[in-house]
């Protein structure tokens, strides 16, 4: 049984070894395995929308009536895998794969926006904190809409008396988005709750 699509740490470890230590040996030695994992995830999607999940945004702090669409969460993580694989291809200098993953990133971004973005409400999927934060944090959201989608994350946090409704997969992205879009104070309030 393959891992959940939200298991991006394999690629992040290779990227971080290079980013923080200048060591590209992990990227080089693991390259074919990293690529095989990403290609497997691509094979489990139709038009860049994944077809499975095991956990999605798991361990939500409260029983929410509206929970994140776990296929959306897995698909957003497919997008993140594609971005990470392109970075790793750049680190090792694989020009063909750089071009391949650049194209995949754009096609995946388009598929997610076409299927999940509501241009009227400026929400992704069901409009949960996780879904909107993933879209902004990972770069799925079009730049012209990022501030509005980020503001929807903030408004939802405020409406819930500074509580985060995201689980293990989404909370960090909620914090990233709040901090990046001028609401670091909201992160502090969430943590104090």
Regions inferred by a protein language model and the residue ranges of each:
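Active-site core of glycosidic bond-cleaving carbohydrate-active enzymes
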Residues: 1-193
């Amino acid at each position: 049984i393959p891992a959940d699509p939200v298991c991006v740490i394999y690629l992040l470890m290779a990227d971080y070894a290079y980013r923080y230590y200048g060591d590209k040996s992990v990227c080089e030695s693991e390259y074919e395995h990293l690529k095989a994992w990403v290609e497997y995830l691509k094979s489990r999607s139709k038009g860049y929308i994944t077809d499975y999940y095991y956990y999605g945004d798991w361990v939500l702090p409260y029983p929410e009536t509206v929970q994140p669409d776990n296929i959306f969460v897995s698909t957003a993580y497919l997008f993140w895998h594609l971005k990470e694989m392109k970075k790793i291809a750049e680190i090792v200098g694989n020009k063909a794969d750089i071009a391949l993953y650049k194209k995949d990133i754009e096609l995946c971004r388009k598929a997610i926006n076409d299927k999940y973005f509501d241009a009227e409400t400026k929400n992704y999927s069901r409009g949960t904190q996780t879904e909107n934060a993933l879209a902004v944090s990972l770069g799925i959201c079009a730049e012209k809409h990022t501030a509005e989608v980020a503001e929807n994350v903030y408004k939802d946090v405020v409406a819930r008396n500074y509580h985060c409704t995201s689980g293990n997969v989404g909370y960090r992205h909620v914090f990233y988005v709040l901090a990046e879009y001028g609401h670091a104070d909201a992160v502090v309030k969430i943590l104090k709750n």
